[in-house]
A protein has these predicted regions:
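A cross-kingdom marker for long, charged
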Residues: 127-221
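Extended amphipathic alpha-helical interaction segments
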Residues: 40-170
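Short, flexible domain-boundary/linker segments around small modular repeats
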Residues: 13-33, 96, 154-175
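N-terminal Sec/ER secretory leader and immediately downstream segment
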Residues: 1-57, 61, 65, 206-210, ...
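Solvent-exposed, acidic/flexible segments
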Residues: 10, 29-32, 36-44, 55, ...
Length: 221
């Protein structure tokens, strides 16, 4: 997958220098999601080995870690008013986009403020989604540890889980995630459209640093 990532980012560099469109962003997003799915499927044999080797004590430790992680999430993202959460999201978005584009101009900041105020999902939704995913994963772990299925059967269950990750959500949950994804991509397209030549060079350089990282990883394999 690493050479494919590098090639895709190289193509995105050229798109940025011309005019990055919403359709191109959708294509890039779909490519990344499909690549993650393929990489996850390739890891299934290793994951099955790991899960079958776990002890009950290790599973209990995993549950405690998840409980602590969830408590940290609640403290960091849910222990504030809706307005404070919006401000927090704005600061996080600003940090991310400054990293990619360089310093944003006044018009881009205005676009971000409008998009942030109208964000289609909140932190509570992502927390609920997080809990659902954790329970699905723990159910697989319990199945492996308690029933000790044969390797092929566990691999099949893991493959079903991975393939269903983006396909088996409820209609309501998937609709919210789709709206959030579209909202994010539209914001990126708008920021790129209003980007200066310097910002485009910054974005190309940022993508090049990732390409270089991928190239190093490929050479080390």
């Amino acid at each position: 997958e690493l050479p494919a990532y590098a090639n895709q980012l190289s193509g995105a560099q050229q798109q940025v220098l011309n005019q990055l469109t919403l359709e191109q962003l959708y294509d890039l997003n779909e490519f990344m999601r499909a690549s993650i799915e393929r990489a996850s499927l390739k890891a299934v044999p290793m994951l099955a080995d790991l899960m079958l080797s776990l002890s009950s004590a290790q599973v209990d430790h995993l549950r405690r870690q998840l409980d602590q992680s969830n408590a940290d999430f609640r403290e960091e993202y849910l222990a504030f008013s809706p307005e404070q959460q919006r401000n927090q999201r704005y600061d996080m978005l600003l940090e991310q986009f400054n990293d990619w584009f360089g310093e944003l101009n006044a018009q881009q900041l205005a676009l971000m403020r409008v998009a942030n105020a109208d964000w289609p999902v909140d932190n509570q939704f992502w927390y609920a989604e997080r809990l659902i995913r954790q329970q699905e994963m723990l159910a697989l772990v319990d199945y492996a540890v308690q029933q000790q299925p044969d390797h092929a059967r566990l691999e099949e269950r893991l493959q079903q889980y991975i393939l269903g990750f983006e396909r088996n959500r409820s209609v309501q949950r998937q609709a919210k995630i789709d709206r959030s994804r579209e909202h994010t991509l539209r914001l990126i397209a708008a920021l790129a459209k209003d980007g200066s030549a310097e910002q485009k060079r910054h974005l190309v350089a940022r993508a090049q640093s990732l390409i270089d990282d991928f190239s190093v990883l490929v050479a080390q394999r």
